[in-house]
Amino acid sequence: CIRDRNNVGAAFLPTWGIDIDLEIGQGFQAKVSSNSVVEIIGTQLMPELTPIELDLGWNMIAYLREEPADVVLVFQEVEESVTIVKDGLGNVYFPDWNFCNIPAMVPGEGYQLKMSAADTLEYLSNDEEY
């Protein structure tokens, strides 16, 4: 890994000895010099017990569930506060325009979203369906 950063710009620069902690539910971006696999060791989170605090402005979040889910349904409880959701491929969900071309939220992927107000995202358990 050459560099990665979290939602607030804190950087992980291993060649310079700069380290950060990953925060539960938060996403991060990584710039690498070649194809890489990131292995994260820890306890698997129960999505229904892990609310994600969303700040006003831009956020990067992790998708914590084990199965893909419809983006519109995942964000239905907070959609009035969501301006845009973006995946890593450039697909978007604009709630105000009733437009979504993100196929689904997928385990292991992160998402950027812009909030018009702070809110809390609460995922359903892995036993429930959207």
Tell what function each PLM region has.
Residues R3-Y130:
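N-terminal exported-region signature
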